[in-house]
Amino acid sequence: MNQKTIEKNVSERVSNLKPHASPEITNEIESCMPDLGSLEAKQWIGVQNPNRIEVLQELRRSTVARVGTGRSGPRPRTQALLRFQADHSRSKDTVLKEVPTEWIEKQGLLEVQSQVSDKNLYLTRPDLGRKLSANAVETLLTQCKTAPDVQVVISDGLSTDAITTNYEDLVPPLLKGLEQAGMCIGTPFFVRYGRVKIEDQIGELLKAKVVVLLIGERPGLGQSESLSCYAVYQPTVEKTVEADRTCISNIHRGGTPPIEAAAIIVDLAKNMLEQQASGIALSR
């Protein structure tokens, strides 16, 4: 058999081959995959042929944990793996995102910054996030009320989404509640690239009796909107330790609702002022 005959036979066989799937079939398969962020995807049952599917459905509706995702041999199902990767990406994104300056201005907040200059430095040098920049110190001394009963501070922390998502349901009711309780409220402001301990310098600088820091939590897998409140009585840079802080964590729509957290923080501030204590020294 000569070379031309071989090439002709190969060409004929290739032309007779059928594609594995037509574009129509491929599109149909792709359209079957739900949006990974949708409620349908979150409540998806991956267990094949379950005995009582209604029990699994109720379990999936009652928790955000990864239950009922099923297996394919020793491996996770494709959709379960894709959701895992999507949730992981979402958590990374909220750490790296910046709170827009336009959003801060819209809320009418004064903005200051820690000694951190950018997000990369914030993640690699947490010590700098615990201190105010020189410009921030000057700004707070000239534009903020001194010696308040309660100073409310908002900071991005490790979750931008936690601040932008929960702010409207948390901060206005909190300020209103503190005012109705008869407390003198300091000027609320936003600290970019802040860490928890920065509230000690703020309290010492403004001579606040109670400092309430609302800061974005390190995100969990797929949960990027969780906020924490760290409240402390008469903090100082040198003497305040972590045991002096009272923490209310997991503030978001799927945890402690923001509006409910506002009421809890108001009661907490009242107790701190009455007992002149916070953290482990505060009686429940």
Swiss-Prot record:
Keywords noted in UniProt: Bacterial microcompartment, Cobalamin, Cobalt, Lyase
Cofactor note: Binds between the large and small subunits.
Family membership noted in the UniProt record: Belongs to the EutC family.
Annotated protein name in UniProt: Ethanolamine ammonia-lyase small subunit
Self-association state and partner proteins as the record states: The basic unit is a heterodimer which dimerizes to form tetramers. The heterotetramers trimerize; 6 large subunits form a core ring with 6 small subunits projecting outwards.
Required cofactor names: adenosylcob(III)alamin
GO biological process: amino acid metabolic process; ethanolamine catabolic process
Main subcellular localisation: other
Function: Catalyzes the deamination of various vicinal amino-alcohols to oxo compounds. Allows this organism to utilize ethanolamine as the sole source of nitrogen and carbon in the presence of external vitamin B12.
Positions that bind adenosylcob(III)alamin: 196, 217, 247
